[in-house]
Amino acid sequence: MTGEEWGLTVLSFLVRVGFFLFGIYQDANFKVRYTDIDYFVFHDAAKYVYEGKSPYARDTYRYTPLLSWLLVPNHYFGWFHLGKVIFVIFDLVTGLIIMKLLNQAISRKRALILESIWLLNPMVITISTRGNAESVLCCLIMFTLFFLQKSRYTLAGILYGLSIHFKIYPIIYCIPIAIFIYYNKRNQGPRTQLTSLLNIGLSTLTTLLGCGWAMYKIYGYEFLDQAYLYHLYRTDHRHNFSVWNMLLYLDSANKENGESNLSRYAFVPQLLLVLVTGCLEWWNPTFDNLLRVLFVQTFAFVTYNKVCTSQYFVWYLIFLPFYLSRTHIGWKKGLLMATLWVGTQGIWLSQGYYLEFEGKNVFYPGLFIASVLFFVTNVWLLGQFITDIKIPTQPTVSNKKNN
């Protein structure tokens, strides 16, 4: 690690400390809390675990029990904010892995700028210091890719299986990862290709099923229903960025049981898109391109998801530095794209403010139109990303080593 990278790491740590301390101050002195509402759910679920009970005794806890186990120290040491410190550590480690992978592909100066997109990103910092657990998943995914690049497929598979156990969505990465491994080992013969694929596949499956079986043995069907099955029929009535939100809300309002039939089919266009974008790795089956494909694939997944909040943006922001390291998009067009992405968010947030803090009924047309604008913008951005990723790039040192 160079002096500049040490400086960036220290600065990013200090900024997070500042956000963390300000959050504690805001919680104590302002009506609007800094702490994420989900953190209270994690904290309460951890209390039940600490008392020898099920985390699902806490209403609205819809996650793996491992997450509640992670916050048990909150109650052991008697400090409410300790879990946030844990999430910030995962956040920083994620940034360090990004730094490691970027340094193998581009110049140090450019890498330093791109690393800052994660390490000094106020959105990323806010999400982890507010007590959102996305940094844990991001760290697991980055470690998966780190060991994948080194061809340590068993370890990569274990971490990948753990990632899917934490949240289902990383399973979409299996297609581009399989394509990368298949082509990465093409010079070593079909037997090596098959062995490598079986290695990561079996280690992933064993870890995923092992974690699932262990949690099922401890917490029973409640674990399966709350951690996994719930998300298949989920209809989130709370306002969020998704264009599906209003449609699902209106559809469920017409049903006696409050469930939406539309919710069952909302994932179809999303599934088709992630399958197609995942196959973009065939276009250029290198490790650098794999990281770019994962960005595009995750962007498509979040854009078409039936629930979309700011924390979901972190899912693809971990790949943004890698995408930008090989992009052909000029700075003027890039600035326009960023402005549209931020601007349409701002329009939606203004409507959300009127609804949540002023109690105004802006569901329609205000909030709905804002969601449509954000969705259309993201669809256009997705098209630009796909077009850009199909342009051939020169192989880097890291790709030559892999091949």
From Swiss-Prot:
Pathway: Glycolipid biosynthesis; glycosylphosphatidylinositol-anchor biosynthesis. GO terms for cellular component: endoplasmic reticulum; endoplasmic reticulum membrane; glycosylphosphatidylinositol-mannosyltransferase I complex. Its main location: endoplasmic reticulum. It comes from the Eukaryota. The keyword Membrane applies. Its EC number is 2.4.1.-. It is a multi-pass membrane protein. InterPro entries: PIG-M (IPR007704). It is an enzyme of class 2 (transferase). Pfam families: Mannosyl_trans. GO terms for molecular function: alpha-1,4-mannosyltransferase activity; glycolipid mannosyltransferase activity. Keywords: Cell wall biogenesis/degradation, Endoplasmic reticulum, Glycosyltransferase, GPI-anchor biosynthesis, Membrane, Transferase, Transmembrane, Transmembrane helix. GO terms for biological process: fungal-type cell wall organization; GPI anchor biosynthetic process; protein mannosylation. The chain crosses the membrane at residues 5-25, 79-99, 111-131, 133-149, 161-181, 194-214, 267-287, 311-331, 335-355, 362-382. Residues 1-4, 100-110, 150-160, 215-266, 332-334, 383-403 are cytoplasmic. It is found in: Endoplasmic reticulum membrane. Residues 26-78, 132, 182-193, 288-310, 356-361 are lumenal. Belongs to the PIGM family. Mannosyltransferase involved in glycosylphosphatidylinositol-anchor biosynthesis. Transfers the first alpha-1,4-mannose to GlcN-acyl-PI during GPI precursor assembly. Required for cell wall integrity. This is GPI mannosyltransferase 1. It comes from Saccharomyces cerevisiae (strain ATCC 204508 / S288c) (Baker's yeast).
